């Protein structure tokens, strides 16, 4: 057994997969719930605008997919011992943990932003139609925050060091 590949290294990889999925889905759930409340409130007064105003809910849901992508890639990259010898280095485990944290936490931040903007934006655009384009632009920038985390996570999952 080498200091480069301790038996605890896979724990960090699996934690990376878990935090990517958990935090990204927390953000997606918050964004969906918060903007869904806005859509529901607006739909009482103007039901014809409900389908047009569903964009924040969909954008928040996509954040959960980002976390799922990183979690699956990390989960497939974690290697168990072969013939009693570890095959997964601590460098790789820490890289996978960093990938999960980058994707998960940026997904959570994006979900919070999408929820707040979606709730207020949907209600405001029901009152003043000109605000719809501005709301969509702000939502796109908020979604980009989650996308940045996905990109960094994908780069970090490709980093690995051999055990030899």
UniProtKB/Swiss-Prot annotation:
It is found in: Vacuole membrane. The record marks 143 as: Essential for proton translocation. Proton-conducting pore forming subunit of the membrane integral V0 complex of vacuolar ATPase. V-ATPase is responsible for acidifying a variety of intracellular compartments in eukaryotic cells. Its main location: membrane. The keyword Transmembrane applies. Keywords: Hydrogen ion transport, Ion transport, Membrane, Transmembrane, Transmembrane helix, Transport, Vacuole. It is a multi-pass membrane protein. Belongs to the V-ATPase proteolipid subunit family. V-ATPase is a heteromultimeric enzyme composed of a peripheral catalytic V1 complex (main components: subunits A, B, C, D, E, and F) attached to an integral membrane V0 proton pore complex (main component: the proteolipid protein; which is present as a hexamer that forms the proton-conducting pore). It holds the Pfam family ATP-synt_C. The chain crosses the membrane at residues 11-31, 54-74, 97-118, 131-155. The keyword Ion transport applies. This is V-type proton ATPase 16 kDa proteolipid subunit. GO terms for molecular function: proton-transporting ATPase activity, rotational mechanism. SUPFAM superfamilies: F1F0 ATP synthase subunit C. Residues 32-53, 119-130 are cytoplasmic. NCBIfam families: V_ATP_synt_C. Residues 1-10, 75-96, 156-164 are lumenal. The gene is VAP. One of its GO terms (cellular component) is vacuolar membrane.
